[in-house]
């Protein structure tokens, strides 16, 4: 959830400027507590020329234990992984093709075999099911050298599990 809509819109605008340079941008929320339920992003080198700061991603970190989360908070270079991306579709698809082409092949096949149903585009189930069962974070973001992290202060909090 986002509490401050105006700041979020401004962050999206800033992120779009970074994405226009070929980066896959991920919002990182500055932690205010050592939370063990969120993944973290370690801030890398500064990307020059962006108002408000943009950074490379030094590391993606799984949900830590309490001691590790406290260390991340104390160090100051770690941000909660919001799971919110801003990217150019062409750049993203190029990275998917490069890093895990099975995903793109399955998606293209499912789209090619899709059907119009009451004004909805229904993807062909079998082709879609053949796509690897892997998150964008694991398949692309943790492998790409095009990732960028934009710090946000928008009152973000995770909505939790959908399961």
Identify what each model region corresponds to.
Residues 38-163:
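Catalytic core of tubulin tyrosine ligase-like
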